[in-house]
Amino acid sequence: MHINFDEAQMFCKWKDKRLPSEEEWIYAAYTEMRKTSSSNFIYGQTYEYPVGDTPEGVNCLEDCKFKNNVNYKKLLSRGNGHSKVGVTKKGINGLYDMGANVWEWANIENKRTKATKGGSWWYGKEQMHLKHQARKDKKMSAVYIGFRCVKSLN
């Protein structure tokens, strides 16, 4: 995506939204908050990965058992590249692509570095684990970093 933190934040603001805080991102990605779920996720339970107890079904470098619907292998020296949005396994809270595909910017108080969450197709399953911490310079951009906007409810 090649979007740095400030660019992602400006886009969200333009859409009358914002980047999630790191805490909001973690909560949405790992803790099931739907009282009735069409998946087998249990209300109130926190999972190890954004798709449950294992990383199976997401677009990561290895160990995730996902077959990408787009073949970038000839263009890349590593990994499979991005997958189309929403084609990976549906995760916690019915959200897609919270694990792997692209790191997502999340806001923290530090002025120079910001959080990136969820891992990406460039990395293995460890980077999308609940306990993984990643910080990047807010001016950094890379093909494997993206974002999602959120809207405050109040």
For the regions a protein language model found, what residue spans apply to each?
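Short, structured beta-strand segments at or near domain termini in extracellular proteins/domains
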Residues: 144-154
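Functional-site microenvironments in short loops/helix caps that host divalent-cation chemistry
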Residues: 1-134, 138, 143
